[in-house]
Amino acid sequence: MKTRKSLSTLLIVAASVFMPSKVNAQDPEPNDYTDGSAWLCRPDQQDACAVDLSTTVIAADGMISLEGWSSDPSAPIDCFYVYPTVSTDQSTNSDMTPDAAELRVIEQQFARFASVCRPYAPSYRQVTLAGLMATFAGGGPRDLEQGLAYNDVRDAFQHYLEYDNGGRGFVLIGHSQGSYILTRLIRDEIEGHPVQDQMISAFLLGSTVTVAAGEDTGGSFQNIPLCRSAGQTGCVITYASFRSTAPPPQNTLFGQTLEPTLTGACTNPAALGGGSSETHAYLSSGGATIAGPRRTSPWVSSGAAVETPFVSVPGLLSAECTSNEHATYLEITVHGDPSDDRVDDIVGDITPQWGLHLVDVNLAMGDLVQIVQEQTAAWEERR
């Protein structure tokens, strides 16, 4: 049975095994990506991206205002998204029938980008949380960027390029398993190939991207650098978020590498040039994360009803890339004030080694969407 509870439970149990994981499959048939049902989102269909993303903006004094949202079917570029490990299927790899978790993650992480780009999100036979645990228990190698899941995404991307792209620029967006898959896709299919000129940027979130120590390249990619301004294109944005009060422990799942000449990369979407800045978060009003609902306390002390699916909390959160002895990460500071009328904390924690993985994307969603808009303008100007 696919339930929110089972997903949350599997996330906790899988914490000790969340590294990329190889899956043994007996040459299954490739997916038919000419079939619209093989896509969670496409710009030409009503699907998982066609959701209400209206937002209640809550100021520190408890004052409330409403913010609408709409997609832009004529957006000049495309976004191609690969979602994280969320499937509650009990098989090693998920099937191609989306469950509630796969639909929810589109709402939380990707649908909002449709205001600045045409959305493409293929369904794929990802390694499930149950599959991760089974592989670990069997002592097998752990590599999420190989096997059936990678093959599906590669096939979907190749189909997109051949039949949908038409020479347009694109942004790759991934989280967790999706980011590891996209990292390999960039290495194998994009870097050093003509299509690299069309890659406006890649958002590889909630994973570990490496660079040579003190450099912006030289690890995961040889020539594709980290993004250091919103006007820069052909670059990568990557981070894994942790609370300022709970930095990565020794057994962290993100932001570290065993290679002595490499280091984990971090780019702050709220301040690509460096330093600390307020983030533009879009949080679920019901406390939902990619693992299901969490929040029980009201957003404002008055108990005023929040009737939109999302909330924005200006000034509550700030972010800065930093390092400790274990990892490089995006440090999230919560500026709660018990004397004001607004909520003082956020949800998203699981165990210390995960950090705020469940809300990595939500924490800076507004910043990421704005970056796509600015990078698109810069890319078009240089064409």
Residue spans of the language-model regions?
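N-terminal module-boundary/linker segments of secreted carbohydrate-active enzymes
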Residues: Q26-S65
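C-terminal segment of classical bacterial N-terminal signal peptides
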Residues: S16-V23
